[in-house]
């Protein structure tokens, strides 16, 4: 799915910007939090704390959306989400995060949210 991004779109998702992660709360409201994320192939990843609300929401609903905005430029990635808890999977997510942002602090409760991107929306010039 991410083959729909142009080189300009790929450049945008490698720049150092924060984004928002949106998930569905138990009461049906939208839970939106700031996150750092990475995109590799058709998978967006967010590293986070295992007991966080966003993890609970993904476990319950399995859907998520990431939105990144910088001035008038924007990109939204939507898809199905799962929680990665395996040591190698989480280490890979941390490695990707460190390459885009910085090395995160050690967190023994860390997990990763993996979103298989099924829909991409964004600024003109970002999507093929």
Task: Show where each model-derived region lies.
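Extreme N-terminal tail/first-helix region
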Residues: 1-15
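Charged, gly/pro-rich active-site loop segments
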Residues: 1-4, 71-128
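Short, flexible segments with low predicted structural confidence
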Residues: 8, 29-31, 94
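A generic structural signal for short, non-catalytic loop/turn and secondary-structure boundary residues
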Residues: 14, 59, 68-70, 106-108
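Short beta-strand segments
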Residues: 16-49, 58, 64-67, 76-77
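Generic structural signal for secondary-structure transition and capping sites
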Residues: 17-18, 63, 102, 120
């Amino acid at each position: 799915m991410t083959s729909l991004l142009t080189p300009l779109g790929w450049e945008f998702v490698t720049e150092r910007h924060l984004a928002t992660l949106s998930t569905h709360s138990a009461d049906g409201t939208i839970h939106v939090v700031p996150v750092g994320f990475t995109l590799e192939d058709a998978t967006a990843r967010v590293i986070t704390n295992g007991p966080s609300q966003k993890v609970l929401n993904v476990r319950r609903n399995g859907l998520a959306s990431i939105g990144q905005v910088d001035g008038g430029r924007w990109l939204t990635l939507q898809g199905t989400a799962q929680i990665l808890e395996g040591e190698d999977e989480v280490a890979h997510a941390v490695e990707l995060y460190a390459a885009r942002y910085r090395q995160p602090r050690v967190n023994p409760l860390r997990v990763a949210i993996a979103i298989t991107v099924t829909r991409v929306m964004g600024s003109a010039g970002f999507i093929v």
